[in-house]
Amino acid sequence: MTTSAPEHLSLPLGDGSAVLAFDVGGTDMKAAIVDDVGRILDIVRVPTPIDGERTADAVVARIGELAQELLRNHPDVRPLAAGLLVPGHVDEDNGVGVFSENLGWSNYPFRDRAEATLGIPVSFSHDVRGAGEAEYRLGAAAPFRDVVVMAIGTGISGAIFIQGTLYSGGGMAGEMGHSKVADGPKCVCGGHGCLEAVASAGAIARRYAQATGQVVSGAKDVLDRAARGDVHAMEIWESALDALALDLSHTVALLAPEAIVIGGGLSQAGAALFEPLQRRLDAILTFHHRPQLLCASIGENAGVIGAALRARDLVDDRAAAP
């Protein structure tokens, strides 16, 4: 277990309700507690409990344990709601995790189970849409009305804002990772040549290992090898950039965003990602408006901050209801 010290949590959320927040990822999950003046008092990070068909039950049980730990450490805080973000396809209206290729659940009633475990109302959403809301309200996407926030990590997905409103498409919008960009590797969704199977951080490392027989620690290792002239690493990185640029060109043609904000682990490559990606995108586009490509600014805690914001929204909405 790792806990982020409060001095590192520098995004005040403002006055509002005290809440709990949970961000479930494919590798790790985070839990946070926020007080009524918007201070993020604690963030706890633990491995996501992977247990086959029982993974969703294990996740909810772990949420309960983390909540108890946070409340023990901060006994004066009385959360009025919680926010829960999970990966995969979600039905926000009914609180259901419809399908997760990477974690294996199907039609799981996350909101009901989490509310039963925590004893407070729960706002339920998709992990990238939640992180996107944090970037839109508090981060690099804040200056824009029409903007896409894209996360490139274990998978690839996005949050779409049109005229300042998050567009969810019934829980299915923003699945850029499962658009076809090449005749290529099989994806966990069952398709072939999906962007996620070519250009996600996990895919870059996996493709290099398959091409060379050498196990690497991650996409950063592949980028480092490419910078040193490793031909296989260079080819894999170049193909990932080509696929990303093609996918972004489709996004631009369809939505004409003012900006595309990129977060997730791969965004940490910095100029090695953004400069060649911008050149490739510019080469594809013709008459289209060219969006700014920006690095997400909130960092690795964007998801759990987004979950906290959504939990506060839930409290406010219920208070305002007739």
Which role fits each region the language model picked out?
Residues 95-106:
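A charged helix-plus-loop insertion that forms the helical arch/lid used to bind
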Residues 1-81, 91-94, 112, 116-122, ...:
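ATP-binding/phosphotransfer module of carbohydrate and carboxylate kinases, centering on a glycine-rich
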